[in-house]
């Protein structure tokens, strides 16, 4: 375990310390028991002293009961510490991801993050729980048992002094060989989980194109590769068992030979030899524990590296010390803005963008696929930082604002509409968790969603399931618009968010915006000219450059790109009629 991950122990430090403490007490009792057995055999049984046998036998039972009690307490403490540590680790990863910018998130796949928070954390939890118990138990058991063996017979003790380092070195060698293979296994788990996620999310597309067999074959290929990698790792780890067994049998054979000779020549009593055999088993069992924990640690090390990648990731965007917490108005300025997703030196998605949007204006943005319309608006709430230049909101550079304060005043309905499991009411209240039912209904009326919501038997308490699969695309878009409106933002951005809505409903939404939220700056990205035709200004984008700004009439007269789009849609529609 590295220091980054150990910080997550926090309030479970007490249990993490108590577990090995009780393990030490348990081991002390277990180590003293064979010594008592030797006395019972050599003094009690061999001399026929019944009272001595009873007296020492009672002490033996008490020791055994104490060992059992300490073992139970140690197990309980280790379980609490392990489960608590895993809980904190999950929280830490989840909280860290919440701090990430889009650029940070782009470095990790969704399935990779899910695997880290489930499989990887479970591996680390098991290794931690085993470590604080067995890694405390095994070394102490080996040392104390060896000391007791040394007191009974120096020759046999010397035998173990040779065997233990040899075995330990072999186990470490096996662990180092297996570790890289386990890393590959868990990286491949990400791909496997991603395949499952894609298939489930796109199940309707898969069935529509009758691609079930193709998906099964693809999944089988990935699954088989995971199996191959895991088998390679396990084949290396499998050497632990034969190495351990060979060591145990060799040690026992040598020990019996040495011990038998010592008894024959009167250097040892039978009871002492019995104790030495018990101590030998204790040492061997401790070594087997180390082997078992080593396997767990090997797996956990690969998981630890992957978890640390997330926790060590530095958020691209952080608030300044005296960040501004209030946005004055919805005025927006782009001043010589360049942007690249790859950062400095990468291919530019936006090139020398200069733009001024007055507070309260309705702005339309139009352009072909790949013209960076979405990229442009994502810079306003600072979902990404500019590569060069400045984006200003309310007269200030967006980097001067507290991120939460800025994004609270910039509502954005993204291209991919996302609804969460819960009622319609709960989904809308994502925009403002303290909103009343009246406020929720008001924004739903503005978004033209109130009508279809009331047609559901449960109305606003209708459950949304599986990211909104029980509502249509147009209904989903209107619910997302209502959610954005509930924030009462100074800037509202609709990124092609009415594409699944019919033209009549689209017109009603725009009319409601004009009448009900005139002071809010409204930016509408659309493929339909009719959705932005009446905007105060229309921005024409092409390959990351602004090719024209003006009203629809002005652009028809001066901008060839806009004129072609307009004529293809408006005149094309007339021809269809």
Model-predicted segments: where are they?
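Helix-loop-helix
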Residues: 49-55, 144, 148-162, 232-306, ...
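Hydrophobic alpha-helical transmembrane bundles that constitute the permease/transmembrane domains
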Residues: 20, 24-32, 65-72, 124-127, ...
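ABC-type nucleotide-binding domain
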Residues: 326-577
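An intracellular "coupling" helix at the cytosolic face of ABC transporter transmembrane type-1 domains
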Residues: 11-13, 99-103, 119-132, 136, ...
């Amino acid at each position: 375990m590295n220091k980054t991950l150990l910080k997550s122990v926090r309030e479970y430090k007490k249990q993490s310390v108590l577990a090995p403490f009780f393990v030490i007490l348990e081991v002390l009792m277990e180590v003293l028991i064979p010594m008592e057995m030797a006395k019972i055999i050599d003094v009690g049984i061999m001399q026929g002293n019944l009272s001595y046998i009873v007296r020492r036998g009672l002490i033996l039972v008490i020791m055994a009961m104490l060992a059992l009690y300490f073992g139970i307490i140690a197990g309980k403490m280790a379980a609490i510490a392990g489960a608590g540590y895993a809980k904190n680790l999950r929280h830490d990863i989840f909280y860290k991801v919440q701090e990430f910018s889009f650029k940070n998130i782009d470095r990790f796949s969704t399935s990779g993050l899910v695997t880290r928070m489930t499989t990887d954390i479970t591996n680390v939890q098991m290794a931690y729980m085993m470590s604080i118990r067995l890694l405390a138990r095994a070394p102490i058991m080996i040392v104390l048992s060896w000391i007791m063996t040394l007191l009974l017979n120096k020759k046999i003790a010397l035998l173990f002094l040779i065997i233990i380092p040899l075995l330990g070195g072999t186990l470490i060698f096996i662990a180092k060989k297996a570790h890289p293979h386990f890393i590959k296994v868990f990286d491949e788990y990400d791909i496997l989980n991603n395949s499952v996620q894609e298939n489930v999310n796109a199940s309707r597309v898969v069935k529509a194109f009758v691609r079930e067999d193709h998906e099964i074959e693809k999944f089988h290929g990935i699954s088989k590769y995971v199996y191959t990698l895991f088998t390679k790792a396990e084949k290396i780890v499998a050497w632990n068992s034969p190495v351990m067994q060979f060591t145990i049998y060799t040690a026992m054979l040598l020990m019996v030979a040495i011990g038998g000779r010592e008894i024959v020549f009167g250097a040892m009593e039978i009871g002492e030899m019995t104790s030495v055999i018990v101590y030998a088993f204790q040492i061997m069992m401790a070594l087997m524990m180390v082997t078992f924990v080593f396997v767990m640690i090997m797996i956990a090390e690969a998981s630890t590296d992957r978890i640390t990648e997330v926790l060590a990731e530095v958020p691209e965007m952080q608030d300044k010390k005296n960040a501004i917490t209030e946005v004055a108005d919805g005025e927006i300025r782009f001043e010589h803005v360049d942007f690249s997703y790859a950062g400095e030196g990468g291919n530019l998605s936006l090139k020398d963008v200069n733009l001024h949007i007055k507070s309260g204006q309705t702005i339309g943005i139009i352009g072909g696929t790949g013209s960076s319309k979405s990229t442009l608006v994502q810079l306003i709430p600072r979902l990404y930082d500019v590569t060069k230049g400045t984006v200003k909101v309310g007269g200030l550079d967006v980097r001067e604002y507290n991120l939460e304060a800025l994004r609270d005043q910039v509502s954005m309905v993204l291209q991919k509409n996302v609804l969460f499991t819960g009622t319609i009411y709960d989904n809308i209240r994502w925009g403002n968790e303290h909103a009343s039912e009246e406020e929720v209904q008001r924004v739903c009326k503005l978004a033209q969603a109130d009508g279809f919501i009331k047609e559901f038997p449960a109305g606003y308490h209708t459950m949304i399931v599986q990211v909104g699969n029980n509502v249509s695309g147009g209904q989903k878009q209107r619910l997302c618009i209502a959610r954005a409106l509930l924030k009462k933002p100074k800037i509202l951005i609709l990124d092609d968010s009415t594409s699944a809505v019919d033209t009549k409903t689209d017109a009603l939404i725009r009319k409601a915006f004009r009448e009900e939220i005139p002071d809010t700056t409204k930016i509408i990205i659309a493929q339909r000219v009719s959705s932005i035709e009446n905007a105060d200004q229309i921005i024409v984008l092409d390959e990351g450059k602004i090719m024209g700004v003006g009203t629809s009439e002005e652009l028809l007269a001066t901008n060839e790109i806009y004129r072609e789009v307009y004529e293809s849609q408006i005149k094309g529609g007339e021809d269809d009629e």
